[in-house]
UniProtKB/Swiss-Prot annotation:
The species this protein was found in: Mesorhizobium japonicum (strain LMG 29417 / CECT 9101 / MAFF 303099) (Mesorhizobium loti (strain MAFF 303099))
Gene expressing this chain: nrdR
Co-factor remark: Binds 1 zinc ion.
Keyword Transmembrane set for record: no
Protein name, entry field: Transcriptional repressor NrdR
Membership in a protein family: Belongs to the NrdR family.
Pfam families, A to Z: ATP-cone (PF03477), Zn_ribbon_NrdR (PF22811)
Function: Negatively regulates transcription of bacterial ribonucleotide reductase nrd genes and operons by binding to NrdR-boxes.
HAMAP family: NrdR
GO molecular function: ATP binding; DNA binding; zinc ion binding
Keyword Metal-binding: yes
Keywords: ATP-binding, DNA-binding, Metal-binding, Nucleotide-binding, Repressor, Transcription, Transcription regulation, Zinc, Zinc-finger
Chain positions of all zinc fingers (unnamed): 3-34
GO biological process, one term: negative regulation of DNA-templated transcription
Amino acid sequence: MRCPYCQSEDTQVKDSRPAEDGAAIRRRRVCPDCGGRFTTFERVQLRDLVVVKKSGRKVPFDRDKLLRSVEIAVRKRNVDPERIDRAVTGIVRQLESSGETEVASGEVGRLVMEALKSLDDVAYVRFASVYRNFREAKDFHELLGELKGDEDKSEEDAG
């Protein structure tokens, strides 16, 4: 693996351990040339996914972009980074196990909203405001009404 600091091709693995509930391997690496230390993750990729944008344009699926989107939604919220990573891994698994090589961007957004709903309500609302293209305060009000309705329903089911 190439060193991200000096571009040397000769790096050494110092530590390997399972990550993401066994879905990945986390490796700590060191570069003997510059002494730089960095972490890599090795994951199984079942198939190359392609995201079909609203415009019809097709782009390769990017797990890191998905992770960044979720991290932006949960920014400054008290959400354990491991829970975020598990949610992203779950979304990727759902997409890969669908059997399709192309997925609509709207489907990715729907899965993110589903995951955020169980992670953090504020992050859910933040993401929804962009995903659903909110224009007015009433859009937020309607979404909060949906959330409230879901909570009431959950309490009824539990009680």
